[in-house]
């Protein structure tokens, strides 16, 4: 059985971590490479970098950051934010990313997913879906940092991009993000059941039980969290031990 992955996420702007990382052993809590090194040593299964400004002006900074991180870390690295074309994917893979995540660009033109998957393989193409509840059992995709409604049904879109060659879905509940109230489990379950590819649950983790629920109730293949790890409330090792004690197969740190 495949192991469930635990994935810390770093929000990066202009080459700096913006939701600070409060590790006592870091020389510079704002340096993504320092944070990545700490997570690598702690046994994280993967790391996600999201370039939240995502402008082409700072793309060179992001390429440099990916290269410096890949040189120092062994865990797979997913990079997203402002990825619009297969040329962007190629440049990030050459810089050292293992996977590249599309978000708004895939919503605007889903053919970009197929084009990238055909060129580089589905295994390195992630589609990030930011969804909000619009009615019981119905979720809509929002883009541009959650500011722009699309009217697109999240489950239908997930099925569409999976059929076009996406290798993985990074699913964030915008209703839960930052609330520490736990994942949106009905949303996570609906998409996990609808697609034949792995789903990473994101948005709302406040306790280790929430990580467990994302898998046991949400059906996720991986769980992503930020603040519970960044601020030192829990370690990756504690999270893995808790999930293992709940019967979830993990790669022990």
Curated annotation (Swiss-Prot):
EC nos: 4.3.2.10
Pfam family, one: His_biosynth
UniProt-annotated catalytic positions: 11, 130
Enzyme class per UniProt: lyase
Record GO biological process: L-histidine biosynthetic process
Pathway involvement of the protein, from the record: Amino-acid biosynthesis; L-histidine biosynthesis; L-histidine from 5-phospho-alpha-D-ribose 1-diphosphate: step 5/9
Any one GO cellular component localisation term in the record: cytoplasm
Compartments, record wording: Cytoplasm
CDD domains hit by this protein: HisF
GO MF annotation list: imidazoleglycerol-phosphate synthase activity; lyase activity
Keywords for this protein: Amino-acid biosynthesis, Cytoplasm, Histidine biosynthesis, Lyase
Catalytic activity: 5-[(5-phospho-1-deoxy-D-ribulos-1-ylimino)methylamino]-1-(5-phospho-beta-D-ribosyl)imidazole-4-carboxamide + L-glutamine = D-erythro-1-(imidazol-4-yl)glycerol 3-phosphate + 5-amino-1-(5-phospho-beta-D-ribosyl)imidazole-4-carboxamide + L-glutamate + H(+)
Subunit and interaction comment: Heterodimer of HisH and HisF.
Family according to the record: Belongs to the HisA/HisF family.
PANTHER family linked to this entry: IMIDAZOLE GLYCEROL PHOSPHATE SYNTHASE HISHF, IMIDAZOLE GLYCEROL PHOSPHATE SYNTHASE SUBUNIT HISF/H IGP SYNTHASE SUBUNIT HISF/H
Task performed by this protein: IGPS catalyzes the conversion of PRFAR and glutamine to IGP, AICAR and glutamate. The HisF subunit catalyzes the cyclization activity that produces IGP and AICAR from PRFAR using the ammonia provided by the HisH subunit.
UniProt name for this protein: Imidazole glycerol phosphate synthase subunit HisF
Native source organism of the sequence: Cereibacter sphaeroides (strain ATCC 17029 / ATH 2.4.9) (Rhodobacter sphaeroides)
């Amino acid at each position: 059985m495949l192991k469930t992955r635990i994935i810390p996420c770093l929000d990066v702007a202009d080459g700096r971590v913006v939701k600070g990382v409060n590790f006592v052993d870091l020389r510079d809590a704002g340096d993504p490479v320092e944070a990545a090194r700490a997570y690598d040593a702690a046994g994280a299964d993967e790391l996600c970098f999201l370039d939240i400004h995502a402008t082409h002006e700072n793309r060179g900074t992001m390429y440099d950051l990916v290269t410096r991180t890949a040189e120092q870390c062994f865990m797979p690295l997913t990079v997203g934010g402002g990825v619009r074309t297969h040329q962007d994917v190629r440049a990030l893979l050459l810089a050292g990313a293992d996977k590249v995540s599309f978000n708004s660009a895939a919503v605007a033109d889903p053919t970009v997913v197929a084009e990238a998957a055909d060129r580089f393989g589905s295994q390195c193409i992630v589609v990030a879906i930011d969804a909000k509840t619009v009615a019981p059992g119905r979720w809509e995709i929002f883009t541009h940092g959650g500011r722009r409604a699309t009217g697109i049904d999240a489950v239908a879109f997930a099925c569409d991009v999976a059929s076009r060659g996406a290798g993985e879905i990074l699913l964030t509940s915008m209703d839960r993000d930052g609330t520490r109230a736990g994942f949106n489990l009905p949303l996570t379950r609906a998409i996990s059941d609808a697609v034949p590819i792995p789903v990473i649950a994101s948005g709302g983790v406040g306790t280790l039980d929430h990580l467990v629920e994302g898998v046991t109730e949400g059906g996720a293949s991986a769980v992503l969290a930020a603040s519970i790890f960044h601020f030192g409330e829990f370690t990756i090792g504690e999270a893995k031990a808790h999930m293992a004690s709940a019967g979830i197969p993990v790669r022990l740190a």
